[in-house]
């Protein structure tokens, strides 16, 4: 599996990074698919930026990218993290490892990703397009489905 998680050079989830990685994967004779880690280096190690990362991924999916096959998220019931300690001192539902999005934010992110996949599927079905191995970029998701509202990058 190939997982883009960002690194010393910064994030690698944007369209140009995904396209380059997919070209390298295809050039190596491997199936054209990868996952993106919305946390770690791609969020600048700030769990609150995961929705920004996933909004970019949703836009890529909604406009036709079929090589994105998965997204990794840091999620728990409550936002943030806490230091490990005696059970009586811990907040139930909050991470003791990496900082996480809360469940409400996670639900919104997953809803946006679901809408992006539906937009892509609806467009492909409406055009009766045979899905090629490396599809051309499609129209804007809002042009295809005006009801789709992706989270803003702010």
Mark where each language-model region is:
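Expand to "…catalyze enediolate/carbanion chemistry for C-C bond making/breaking, isomerization
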Residues: 1-131
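Serine/threonine-rich low-complexity intrinsically disordered regions
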Residues: 42, 151-152
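Ala/Thr-enriched low-complexity intrinsically disordered regions
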Residues: 129, 133-134, 142-143, 153
């Amino acid at each position: 599996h190939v997982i883009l998680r960002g690194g010393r050079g910064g994030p690698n989830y944007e369209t140009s990074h995904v396209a380059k990685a997919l070209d390298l994967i295809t050039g190596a004779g491997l199936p054209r698919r990868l996952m993106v880690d919305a946390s770690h280096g791609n969020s600048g190690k700030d769990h609150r930026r995961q929705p920004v990362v996933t909004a970019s991924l949703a836009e890529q999916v909604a406009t036709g990218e079929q090589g994105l096959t998965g997204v990794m998220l840091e999620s728990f019931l409550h936002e943030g993290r806490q230091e490990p300690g005696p059970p009586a001192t811990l907040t139930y539902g909050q991470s003791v490892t990496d900082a996480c999005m809360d469940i409400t934010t996670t639900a919104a992110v997953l809803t946006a990703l679901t809408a992006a996949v539906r937009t892509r599927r609806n467009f492909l079905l409406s055009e009766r397009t045979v899905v090629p191995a490396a599809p051309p970029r499609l129209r804007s998701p809002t042009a295809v489905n005006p009801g789709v509202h992706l989270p803003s990058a702010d």
